[in-house]
Structures are given as structure tokens and as C-alpha cells.
């Protein structure tokens, strides 16, 4: 086992990465190794998808499957080894079908890629794990060095984050052939184990640029189906009655669950990255969408144990449900998996609803505590002139984009302290689950404009980018000249690709934490600092002083 893709990876003087029987996320060595095997199979599939496009062959089954299967290897998504192997077998079957299509056009069709003809050696998981050793990401570290390995992983993990957003968009009916062609090209190239530093750096920027387009079609999918989010108050306390909790990012799953629970007497609560769903008109119209439950994903083993109903996980993040003994009432959807947990293959939630009706639910309603969400792209753009007016009248000094992933590391209290230290004449724009560090606190307003503005999920960084570009255009300056600072927390691969997106768009002087990614060497961090001004957090006092005086 070698995995260094998330923030909680093991860090030692000898090197970074989980490499024992089990990773810090709870992923076993077996599952981790089989995910490496799956990635190799997907690289071979992409190699043939690139070749097929040369013949004008576009296979939509391949295009929809490839990013979805890659998504299953993202942190805290799928811990079920047999399902990972199932994805690998499906990748190979699709590859062979695509290969046959190519050969039907050109009998001499060939692909020069080491993954192009990969076959699984056995049905036995142990044998497959041994085969996977051939594809462990650091297998040639001694030959290429830590810097090349780190850049490869930056590209691989960034592309994995983009693949997750591609799947979210695909679920909502969004498809862009250019994006899929670019995805396959990059995925296939990474399967050749590239070792050129400049080429890898260029690839990382290409991934960021591609992901901006992915976030654009995801935004179109969400707003097209569920309307543009508008500011909405959400109760974060319990309401009496039977209940279901839904977590993850998939708004379509939430919509289907709301439709199917309507009139059943079962209330629905959002968790984690589902919180922004309350801002969408077509979702909040369901009166039994009663509130948001819990805090950051890392607290779920305590909070889910206390929730008196079933829980549905639609995407990341799931962690071991046996710890809180709620594994008999947590359900996985789509690419999510945990051994022994019931999985919903389709969009029928009747079994979950039946379980909710058999459980006690909340015995009484607590005193409501309301927070505000729903500052989507349209709302943010509508406030652009107000922001400019406040700045011109010196009522608004600075905007801090304070967002990203949450996690268990104690140093993450920095983000709470930073938010509460922001001066009263400054605004906080937040997104993703890092907001749970401070989103239940009171921040007041500036002439009626809330000082805490929740823009949505991690992918809604797109809205923040569009706002920044709009403000810059109206003020006749560059984005980096705005009174705007980005202070981002990271945990997994979606955050990595958001960072690459920002860097590829030329955004500079981003501050990140609580730690640097374990796969980025001091040399690589120095390169990113020199090219983009990217740096790690220090203390709240020092960072606040530097950012306000920038």
C-alpha cells in the first residue's frame, strides 16, 4: 500500500504516505492496492478512447463510466474491495468493446500505452492485490526522484477531483465532448508514467483549466434543474418527527428522496455538503426538507450515532459506520461503498423510507437556530455593484474567501479563529464544508449586507471566480488587484483541483492549510510559491496583517 492523496496521510521523517495494513482514512491495504489496479485499467480505457476519437468514434458509455469509476477512488468514497474490482472488470470490458470498434474501422489500429492491454490475472482478491503492486504510484520513486513523483501525483489527484465534478455534472444531464476528450487524453498520458517536470507542470495547469469548464457545466446543470439559489434561512436544530439524513453532493438524489418522501410523514435533513441545497427553489419547495443536521464530515461517527433515522451517503465523505454502531441504518448510493453496508443500485428510496417509518425519529422540536445559505452565482453577481459602492465609500475594506474542506486535525481551529478575527468592515465569502468551522456564529452585516456569505458547495468556487472576474472588470483592474484574499483549507482531491483551477486562471497569493499536501516536496512548494505566491498559513495574526496590507 502507498497512498498520500489526503491531508491526514501519515507523515514521518522518512517520508509521507500511508503504507501499512490500513490508511488513516480507514481504507485497507487491499482496497488501496486494488484502487491502484482500477486506475491502471482506467488509464488503458482512456488510451483507447483517445484512439477511438481519431476515427470519429465517441462511446458515451465509456465517457460516462470512466470519470465515475475514477471518482470511486477519491478519499472517503468507496472502501468495498469487490466493487472496486467490479469497476476494473467493467473498464476492461468497455476497453475491449472500444478496441473492437477501432479495429472494425482500421485493422491496424494500435495504442502505444503500457496500460492499453491490461488484464486481471485472477478472480482472487489476494492475487489481484499482488498484481496491483506493479501499479503502485511510487514504484519508480528511486529512479525518478520525489519531485517528479510529487508532480505526477498532483496531476493524478487533480484529475481525480475533476472526474468527481464531471460525474456530478453528468448525473444532471450535462455533457461536453471537449471536456471528455481532454480528460481521456490526460488520463492516458498519466498511464505512461511521464517524468518531464515541465510537461507535468503544464499538465497540472491544463487540468485546472479543464476543471473550470467542468464547474461551468455543473453550475448549469444544478441551476437549470433546481433554479438559481437565493438567500434562505435553514434551521440547524431538530424538528419532531420521523426522519432521514442525506449527505454528500448529489442534488438529484436529494430531489428524488424528497419526491418519494412527500406525504409519508418523514422529514428530510441535509448533512455536510448538502447544506447549500436549501437555497435552490425546486428543492426548498418541499416543506418536509426541514433543516440541516450535524457539522463537519469528520464528526459523523458521533453525530450519525445520535440521529434517530436512516442515513443516505450520495458521495464523499463516508467513514467507518461500525464505530458508532449505525451500520445497519446507513445506505450508500452511486460510487459510495462500505463493506457490509446496504447499497442502493437505483433511485428507489422506498427501503430507506420504510426503515425511517419504523424508527422513533426526533421526539420533540428544539428551539430553532437559523443560518443563511443560498448566495449563488446570480445573487452574488446581483450584489456586485453594492460591493463596489461599499468599497468606494470605505465601508467595505476587504473580502476574504474563507473556504475549502474540513477535517479532524486540531490545527484547523485556525479557520475558526481567522473568521472571528476578520475586522467588522470586512466580508467573509465561504464555500464547501470548511464553513462548518464558523457558519453557526453571528457576524452581523455591513449596511444590510451580511458579513458571512455562503456561496455553496466546493464546486461553487465557480460562482466566487465569476464574481471576482466581474468585480475586476467593473473596477478596471485585474483579479489580483482586488481587495480580495483567498484562505483555503484542503483535505482531498476536489480541493486539489479547485486550487489548480485558481492557479491556472492566474489567481495569486493564495494561503492554504492546515498543512501542505504530503506529496508536494519542499522543492515543489518553492516552485509554486515563486510562480503563484502560494504559501501555507502561519498564525492568524500574522496572516491577517499581511493580507490586509497586501
Curated annotation (Swiss-Prot):
Keywords: 2Fe-2S, Cytoplasm, Iron, Iron-sulfur, Metal-binding, Oxidoreductase. Hybrid [4Fe-2O-2S] cluster binds at residues 249, 273, 317, 405, 433, 458, 492, 494. GO terms for cellular component: cytoplasm. Transmembrane segments: none annotated. [2Fe-2S] cluster binds at residues 3, 6, 18, 25. GO terms for biological process: response to hydrogen peroxide. It is found in: Cytoplasm. It comes from the Bacteria. It catalyses: A + NH4(+) + H2O = hydroxylamine + AH2 + H(+). InterPro entries: HCP/CODH, Hydroxylam_reduct, Prismane-like_a/b-sand, Prismane-like_sf, Prismane_a-bundle. The keyword Zinc does not apply. GO terms for molecular function: 2 iron, 2 sulfur cluster binding; hydroxylamine reductase activity; metal ion binding; peroxidase activity. Its EC number is 1.7.99.1. The keyword Cell membrane does not apply. Binds 1 [2Fe-2S] cluster. The modification Cysteine persulfide is found at residue 405. Its cofactor is [2Fe-2S] cluster; hybrid [4Fe-2O-2S] cluster. PANTHER family: HYDROXYLAMINE REDUCTASE (PTHR30109:SF0). Catalyzes the reduction of hydroxylamine to form NH(3) and H(2)O. Belongs to the HCP family. This is Hydroxylamine reductase. It comes from Shigella flexneri serotype 5b (strain 8401).
Amino acid at each position: 500500500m502507498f497512498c498520500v492523496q489526503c491531508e491526514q496521510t501519515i507523515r514521518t521523517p522518512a517520508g509521507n504516505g500511508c503504507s501499512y495494513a490500513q490508511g488513516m482514512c480507514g481504507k485497507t491495504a487491499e482496497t488501496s492496492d486494488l484502487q491502484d489496479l482500477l486506475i491502471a485499467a482506467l488509464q488503458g480505457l482512456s488510451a483507447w478512447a483517445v484512439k477511438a476519437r481519431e476515427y470519429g468514434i465517441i462511446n458515451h458509455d465509456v465517457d460516462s463510466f470512466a470519470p465515475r469509476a475514477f471518482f470511486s477512488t477519491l478519499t472517503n468514497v468507496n472502501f468495498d474491495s469487490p466493487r472496486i474490482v467490479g469497476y476494473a472488470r467493467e473498464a476492461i470490458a468497455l476497453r475491449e468493446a472500444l478496441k473492437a470498434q477501432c479495429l472494425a474501422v482500421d485493422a491496424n489500429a494500435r495504442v502505444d500505452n503500457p496500460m492499453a492491454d491490461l488484464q486481471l490475472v485472477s478472480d482472487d482478491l489476494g492475487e489481484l492485490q499482488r498484481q496491483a503492486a506493479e501499479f503502485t504510484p511510487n514504484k519508480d520513486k528511486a529512479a525518478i526522484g520525489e519531485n517528479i513523483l510529487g508532480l505526477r501525483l498532483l496531476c493524478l489527484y487533480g484529475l481525480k477531483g475533476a472526474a468527481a465534478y464531471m460525474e456530478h455534472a453528468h448525473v444532471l444531464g450535462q455533457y461536453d465532448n471537449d471536456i471528455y476528450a481532454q480528460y481521456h487524453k490526460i488520463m492516458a498520458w498519466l498511464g505512461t508514467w511521464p517524468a518531464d517536470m515541465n510537461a507535468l507542470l503544464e499538465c497540472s495547469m491544463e487540468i485546472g483549466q479543464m476543471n473550470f469548464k467542468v464547474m461551468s457545466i455543473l453550475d448549469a446543470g444544478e441551476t437549470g434543474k433546481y433554479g438559481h439559489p437565493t438567500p434562505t434561512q435553514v434551521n440547524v436544530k431538530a424538528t419532531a418527527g420521523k426522519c432521514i439524513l442525506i449527505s454528500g453532493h448529489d442534488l438529484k438524489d436529494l430531489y428524488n428522496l424528497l419526491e418519494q418522501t412527500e406525504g409519508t410523514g418523514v422529514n428530510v435533513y441535509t448533512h455536510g455538503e448538502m447544506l447549500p441545497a436549501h437555497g435552490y427553489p425546486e428543492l426548498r419547495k418541499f416543506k418536509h426538507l426541514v433543516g440541516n443536521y450535524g457539522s463537519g464530515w469528520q464528526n459523523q461517527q458521533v453525530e450519525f450515532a445520535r440521529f434517530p433515522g436512516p442515513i443516505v451517503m450520495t458521495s464523499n465523505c463516508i467513514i467507518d459506520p461500525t464505530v458508532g454502531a449505525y451500520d445497519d441504518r446507513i445506505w450508500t448510493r452511486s460510487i459510495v461503498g462500505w463493506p457490509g453496508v446496504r447499497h442502493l443500485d437505483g433511485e428507489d428510496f422506498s427501503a430507506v423510507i420504510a426503515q425511517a417509518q419504523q424508527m422513533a425519529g426526533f421526539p420533540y422540536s428544539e428551539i430553532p437556530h437559523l443560518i443563511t445559505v443560498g448566495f449563488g452565482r446570480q445573487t452574488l453577481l446581483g450584489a456586485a455593484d453594492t460591493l463596489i459602492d461599499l468599497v468606494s465609500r470605505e465601508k467595505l475594506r476587504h473580502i476574504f474567501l474563507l473556504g475549502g474542506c474540513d477535517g479532524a486535525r486540531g490545527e484547523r481551529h485556525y479557520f475558526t479563529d481567522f473568521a472571528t478575527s476578520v475586522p467588522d468592515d470586512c466580508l467573509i465569502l465561504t464555500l464547501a464544508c470548511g464553513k462548518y468551522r464558523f457558519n453557526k456564529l453571528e457576524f452581523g452585516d455591513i449596511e444590510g449586507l451580511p458579513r458571512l456569505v455562503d456561496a455553496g458547495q466546493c464546486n461553487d468556487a465557480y460562482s466566487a471566480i465569476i464574481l471576482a472576474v466581474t468585480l475586476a472588470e467593473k473596477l478596471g483592474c485585474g483579479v489580483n488587484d482586488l481587495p480580495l484574499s483567498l484562505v483555503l483549507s484542503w483535505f482531498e482531491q476536489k480541493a486539489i483541483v479547485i486550487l489548480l483551477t485558481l492557479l491556472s486562471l492566474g489567481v495569486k497569493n493564495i494561503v492554504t492549510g492546515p498543512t501542505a499536501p504530503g506529496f508536494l516536496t519542499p522543492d515543489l512548494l518553492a516552485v509554486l510559491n515563486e510562480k503563484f505566491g502560494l504559501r501555507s498559513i502561519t498564525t492568524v495574526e500574522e496572516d491577517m496583517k499581511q493580507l490586509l496590507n497586501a
